[in-house]
Amino acid sequence: MTRLGPAVRDGRPAPDAAAGPVTARATYAQERAWLASRLAHDPPTYCAVDEFPLHAAVTADDLVHALYVLMDRHEPLRTVLRTVDGRLRQEVHPRPEPRIELADLSAHDHAAQAEERRSLRARLARTPFDPHRAPQWRAAVLNLGEGAWSVVFAAHHTVYDTASGFNVHAELTELCAAAEEGREARLPRLPLGYGAYARRERERARTGGADAAAAHWRTRLRGLPPVHTVPLDRPRPPARTFRGAEVRAALPVGVTAALTGAARHHGTRPVMLFLAAWTALLHHHSGADDLAVGLPVAGRDDPDTRAMVGTFVNMRVLRADLSGDPDGTELVRRTTTAVRAGEKFDIPFQSLVELLAVPRLPGVPPLYQLAFNHTPADGLGPPVSSCEEDLLLDVAGSGLRLVYDAALFDRSTADLLLADYLRLLAVLLDAPGTRLSALPTGPALRHTPRSTGAAPAARTAPRDAAEERVAAVWRTLLGTDSGTVDVHEDFFTAGGHSLQALRLLARLAPARGSGPTLRTFFADPTVAGLATALKSTPDGRTAWR
């Protein structure tokens, strides 16, 4: 392979060195992605990698120029996120220098090209981004010969989502066509920048529409069980580890062929059949009729966002009703109705958690711990080793994987669940009149005693200056100024949430040096644990890095 190395900037004027970055409040989607990546056992999990095939009589320089045009048009491709006084902000740079590699594979046969491309995708996926530098993307331009090109594009989830990939591919295709034909590119108009969208989003959260959404979700989620009852292989630890693993399978050919017809029969979309089968499986193994399932949604209902590159994904909670032993037809109807109702009342997930004042249990994610994701196109991406939920079923085209919390489940359990799911899905498609109680699943998982924690101990007041300092900030953030803080109480059980934890750490950070990391604070979210860290080194700086 002829590898030409990093690309150089094209012939445009150099960026104005005097121009500084522009700052804006982070969007809700950026907050979620940033927090998740900081807590992850494996940060590269939060890197998306797409490969875009292109066919045009162009040069490598034309494609490098096209990537710079994309970066100039879309603010997230020039953005890095920073915390300022405990709040997350976008820092948009005028023209940062991305890493763009060039490789000539034109002399290779198809098999050798495929292997080189696979290796490159894997390398870009596993290379973490510097969280302090823009841009949060990189690319490789591959010459495949005879007018065939491929651009491998890797980006952090804080600046890029699935829909962004379609937009990047469309714009690259048009820019190549324009270069080939010697004309100006006809690119879609961008009605607003991402920073302006962030401001609009915050403003809408304060309007009457937000009140209607709040009222809907208060009613819909009232009395929701705080944690699922799917049996665990081990008691839940008091702090989340975010350590995950996965098992994969391919959809049987017969299932794939039957999906479209079955969805048409039910008057719904294929995704609803996948989702209904997932809730049926969880019902079988938990015995619960009332289940919460987290659903990632595109978050691009605003027409002004359709052509933008950035991250817009929100999490929505499906409350699945499996009472009364419904058959498959009724279950699909209930699932479709519940999902459609939620689509009318979108609200940022962080706001929903705060709004509902969700009871927090040690080591338990709020509102839902079981999740489902569906992408119509093939491509599950590289294996993951982090997990935000207890269980996530991820369906992409003709493949699926079950991502599981490795602190809670064994691989053998994940294998069993995935095999059960495929059997259950096939019956749901072939015999929708089958009731839940008659579905051909394996034996239900055995219940393992759940950790109940030690018996409540007497409250312990702050015992030294370090604990007093932490407790003072703790009280202010949680609105408990008049009460005594128990130094062993869990921050999240006491009503705190992730963004408040970020502000807590910011206020306690030393004037110089690094402060505690979110991931380590999550491992011991108490006054005592944080105070120990703050006094762990002679100069007062924390040893947590």
Residue ranges and their predicted role:
Residues M1-H41, H65-D109, L120, R133-P135, ...:
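Short amphipathic alpha-helices and their capping loops
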Residues R3-L4, V427-H447, T484, Q500, ...:
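AMP-binding/adenylate-forming catalytic domain of the ANL superfamily
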Residues L63, G495-G496, L508, L530:
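Short, compositionally simple motifs enriched in small residues
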Residues P76-L81, D290-V293, L518-R519:
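Short, hydrophobic-rich beta-strand element in sensory/regulatory alpha-beta domains
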